[in-house]
């Protein structure tokens, strides 16, 4: 740059103005402290021996040399799994086996969270993979004899993200000579596993015991001088699954920093069995590919006569030499090479069908294939498929087996072979959202939020979902309205404040679900609307730890 320009800029500066040095700064002397990695053994609070009941483990933290704590995580020991059958843990099994977390001081609850909300806040962190996201745990493994090892023992590490981690030492929880108790409530292990009919799940669940340890960072501080701080706690309201248009109401909303809305599927008994499951990799294409591979074994069969081992309601057509068949209004091409002269190719015309009325539209999976090309192997009596064109979708892969044979279906819906049915898998995942396996289908067509009687927000496009991803970096398909964007621990969080005189102390959410075809089984997945209100609290340290809900 020209020297004359530089000189003119420097000489024009008013030397009498007070300015901050941006090329160096005075280093301040911090409070003297020493961080420590602490591990704490817990004790079980379970009152009975029923393996299907929840189990609580508590950890007490009290030490005269510890002044503050944060960064909690737990380690969970998973035992060796042995026996016959197919078995896997769902991804992030460490988080998904947690039902509730609470940090208390005597009778005072300092902070608590539901397991699903904890998972949603942590799943995008790299450390979440340590909670049980790996091919070794999530891929389906098979045992062929009672002594076979299906899964090796391993240890999970689950980070319990809390408000006390927001700004390291500043946001830490100060003990002020109090005993702090961290209580983890676990689900039954049956709620987070995948297995087939051969696996002895009752024995596995009965023998399983949660073996866990709490780990945290503790600070030995010379003179801590704790000051009041603000923390946020989530409140969760779940609507009834039988309500077609739920209108959940959250009362006592005095200072709200955020509100979230999402939809969960509700599966009744025997509705959690599925035809296919991809395992570790669970993208949309993985689910679809796995579903197609399962269907093809029954869809195209090479045999010397009409295929056996199928229900009496199953129908087949013999594929002609040119490979072209017509299934009602759909043309399908089937080309299988190397078929012996004494055998024919058969196409299953009603593999999976669903309809609510006779002689009307029928949802037929067999009609979703347009061309199938492969080669038959006489040695293995199987077909190696090289190219398959189809319109199988993620919703098809997300239909529970029981829906095909439900009373709503006027047809015998599941006409697969007995061998194929024996491969079906029970998939228990308590944190599933939406009506399909990857939460792709946005089932909310309209959202309206009222504060008291006044509407404060309305949308027909998922704008709040996009802003949630933009502002929080979350990959969860969830709609969220955020009222606070202030830096943590520097300013009081901005809130939606109540006006009790005008009746503004409750949030009402009205939603409309999208229209789905009643002839598609996915239409009958029961839905639960979940609304989360994030309330603002103040934590005070005056010899004890006190938590106060902000009401102004």
UniProtKB/Swiss-Prot annotation:
InterPro entries: Poxvirus_Rif-R. It is a peripheral membrane protein. GO terms for cellular component: membrane. Pfam families: Pox_Rif. It comes from the Viruses. Keywords: Membrane. It is found in: Membrane. Its main location: membrane. GO terms for biological process: response to antibiotic. Disulfide bonds: none annotated. Displays structure similarities to capsid proteins. Belongs to the poxviridae protein D13 family. Homotrimer. Self-assembles to form a layer. Interacts with A17 (via N-terminus); this interaction is necessary for D13 association with membranes. Scaffold protein which forms a transitory spherical honeycomb lattice providing curvature and rigidity to the convex membrane of crescent and immature virions (IV). This association occurs concomitantly with viral membrane formation. Targeted by the drug rifampicin, which prevents the formation of this lattice, and hence virus morphogenesis. In the presence of rifampicin, irregularly shaped membranes that lack the honeycomb layer accumulate around areas of electron-dense viroplasm. This is Scaffold protein. It comes from Fowlpox virus (strain NVSL).
